[in-house]
Amino acid sequence: MATHSLSFFFRVLLLLFLTLSERIKGQGVGINYGQIANNLPSPARVAVLLRSLNITRVKLYDADPNVLFSFSNSQVDFMIGLGNEYLQNMSTDPTKAQDWLQQRLEPHISKTRITSIVVGNEIFKTNDHVLIQSLLPAMKSVYAALTNLGLEKQVTVTSAHSLDILSTSYPPSSGSFKEEFIQYLQPLLDFHSQIESPFLINAYPFFAYKDSPKEVPLEYVLFQPNQGMVDPNTNLHYDNMLFAQVDALYSAIKTLGHTDIEVRISETGWPSKGDENEIGASPENAALYNGNLLKLIQQRKGTPAKQSVPIDVYVFALFNENLKPGPVSERNYGLFYPDGKPVYNVGMQGYLPDIIYTSRATTIKILNLWRVVMGLAVAWFILDMGDKMRMR
């Protein structure tokens, strides 16, 4: 009886493991881990959740030491953020970048896999000319500081931008930057090319649909079957808006002389709730958008103009953030509630432990526990099957 019970127990664990592995693959998908909330689980608990989901790429908006500490030896790749408020000082005083790296990155880099620093977020959208002028010098200061530490090959330097930098996005082959930004974007792109770092874009088809629901087919923005559109200049067919937006950015970059810079999606998502005028914000649409997007990522799909380059995406966001300012939608982009329950079904069922783990040793043990238990489950299943075969 005891043997039968254990066999059943491990079969259940094996089934759970196979189900989760089939539902979502970590490769190709990242998650934005925002923390503008007062009800989120501890970083140690989040580490267990992401491990159970097989998500191995995380983007932060800062360099929270508690998060980086909790993910020590976790095999999760981190993009850490350097906030807009640091840029002006770093642009004029490179030692500020050196100090920041020594305080925020160096204590963790030997244990936690930090692969990129995102210098500023949507700088051009601020219309703050001092801030815009500070972006490239600040990025250069950070890169120089990384070089001084011998980390320039291990950690890339980039920045995330809004699609507002484009003046034209339709058709994708005619994508172009706003004229007033070109004087800043040309040297910025030259720097990206020089250090071989990707250009990050925050792309939200939701906004296009919300603003023009009568002109933009819902199926086109939700990756559902639709007629799509054909670019008259290239004859390339687009069946979803996100890919069209990415290719429009590639076209804009090409107009400034670069075909050697990869575009990556640092944010995209769909809100599960919104204000009355935020048409399309619903759990049903959010589930369709993110669920279909995850399928495309797992298929390693490229855009029509870059078919050989699988899209690189960080989904926004891991949790609903109850303290974010702005419309209701801003607080409802999360895939999960703070208690670890899915906001809607996209085939992601993770495990968020109830206990708060605080020590590094305990956190590491918990992160490895999932792997150990699954290994035992597989081993027990094989042994059990072998016994049954011998009995026959």
Swiss-Prot record:
Residues 1-21 form the signal peptide. Belongs to the glycosyl hydrolase 17 family. The active site is at residues 122, 267. This is Glucan endo-1,3-beta-glucosidase 14. It comes from Arabidopsis thaliana. It is an enzyme of class 3 (hydrolase). Gene3D superfamilies: Glycosidases. Its EC number is 3.2.1.39. One of its GO terms (molecular function) is glucan endo-1,3-beta-D-glucosidase activity. GO terms for cellular component: cytoplasm; extracellular region; nucleus; plasma membrane; side of membrane.
